[in-house]
Amino acid sequence: MARKKANYPLVEGLEITTLAAEGKAMGRWNDVVVFVPLTVPGDVVDVQIRSKRRRFMEGFVVRYVKKSPLRAEAFCEHFGVCGGCKWQNLPYGEQLRFKTDQVRDQLTRIGKIELPEIAPCLGSAETQFYRNKLEFTFADRRWLTREEIESAGDIGDAPAVGFHIPGMFDKVLDIRKCWLQPDPSNGIRMEAKRFCVENGYTFHNARSHEGLMRNMIVRTASTGEVMVIVVFNSDDRPRITALLDHLSAAFPEITSLFYIVNTKFNDSVGDLDPVCYRGKDHIIEEMEGLRFKVGPKSFYQTNSAQAYELYKVARDFADLKPGDILYDLYTGTGTIANFCAARCDRVVGIEYVPEAIADAEINSELNGIGNTRFYAGDMKAVLDDAFVAANGRPDVVILDPPRAGVDEPVIGVILRAAPRRIVYVSCNPATQARDLALLDAEYRVEAVQPVDMFPHTHHVENVVKLVRR
C-alpha cells in the first residue's frame, strides 16, 4: 500500500527572530520552533513546511513579506544552492555578534559554570579567499538549480567539478567561481574541467562507480607555493600523464603535483599513497618566522592568517615562563607546540595520528627547535600518571581536541597533574562546555575569546583560559 503523502501547512507571516544551533535561522509559530534556511533575523516570510518533528518544524520560503534591515547582498552566484557560505546574506559584524552569542549560550546552558565577560568574537581580516585548501568533486552530471529546471531550456547532461549538494553524496554543483580560496585555485579547477571534457575523459558516477575523474585537492600557501592532488578512479596511465603534464605546463606556479588512484566506493584517501608526479613532496607555510612543512596528508588550519591570530591568543593565555613545562595535547602536526617552544623550557606533545607526529618532529627540526618531544597514540592510553611522572609535571596544558572534546579519563589525569593554567582551544563550544564543567571544581574560567576561522559560516573556534582556584 502506498504511503500517504503528508499534508504540511503553509505558515504565513513568520518572523525570523534569531539564529540557532548550526547557524539555522528560526522563528516561532503557535509556540513551535520553525527553522527556515537562507533567512536572517528580522525577515518576515511565508513558509511552506516540509517536515515536522515533535519539537520543531522545517520549511522553505515561498514569499518574503518583509526583508530584514540586517540582510546583506550575497556576493557568490552559487549562494543558496552550495552549502559552503550560508551566512553571506548577513553582514559580517552581525555574524561575529551571533558567534559571540553562540559561545555564551553554550558555555552557560551546557556548562552551567561561572563565566567572566566573554570577549567579542575576533574577526578574520579576510572574509573572502581566506582558505588554503579546497577539495573539488568530479561528477558525470551536474546538479540543476530550480531556476534551470523551470526555464525549460536545453540544459543537457553536462558534467560538474565542484561541491556536493548538502546531504546528497551523489549530487554535485558545478562551480564557476569560488570565493573561498585565492588564485590560482579557480583557474586550475576550470582548466582541469575544460581539458578533461575536450579530451573525452569520463567523470565519476557515485552510484555506478564508473568514470575516471574523481576529486581534486588544491592547497595554497602564504609563501606562494601551490599543491595540487588529482584523484583518479583507475590507473589509466596515459590519461593521468596527459592531464598532469597539461596542468603543470598551464600553471607553472604549481610547486607540488600529486596523483592518487582510488578504486574504493568512498572518497576517503587517508589510507592511500599519494604519488608525487612533479615538484616537491610538500609546500611550506610560514608563521612568525617559523616554517611548517605541509604534505599531501598533513593537517594545517585552513585559514592561515587567522590561525596565527588563534595561536597568539592561545600563547598569550598560556603566559609561559622560563623553566615551564608545556603539555600540548592533541598537538596535530605540532604547530602550537613549535609556536610556543621559545617561551618555555620544553614542550611535550601527544597526537593520535603517527603521520602527524612525524610532521611535528620535522617541523621542529626545520626550525632548529630542540626542546619539543612528541608521542603518537590514543590520548587515553598515552597520557596517564606514569607518563606525567616520566616527562615532568606540566606547568601549563594546552588542549586542542577534535569536535568530540576531551575524554573524561584524560581530564582526570590533568586534574591530578594540577598545572597552574589550562588553555582550552575548541572547534565545538558545546563539548568544550561539557569539559569545562568537569574541570570546574579545581579551575575557574578567567578569560574567553571566540575566534572566527570561517567567515560566512556558523562555525566558531573558542579559546578559554583556566587558572587553579
Regions found by a protein language model. Give the residues of each.
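Terminal RNA-binding accessory module
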Residues: 1-78, 373, 381
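Rossmann-like S-adenosyl-L-methionine
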Residues: 2-21, 235-469
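Short, acidic/hydrophobic/Gly-rich beta-strand patch recurrent on exposed beta strands
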Residues: 25-30, 162-165, 360
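Short, conserved phosphate/pyrophosphate- and ester-handling motifs at nucleotide-, phospho-/glycolipid
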Residues: 42, 181, 303
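Extended interfacial segments that mediate partner engagement and assembly in macromolecular machines
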Residues: 62-74, 80-202
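Internal alpha/beta scaffold segment
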Residues: 170-206, 210-212, 220, 234-258
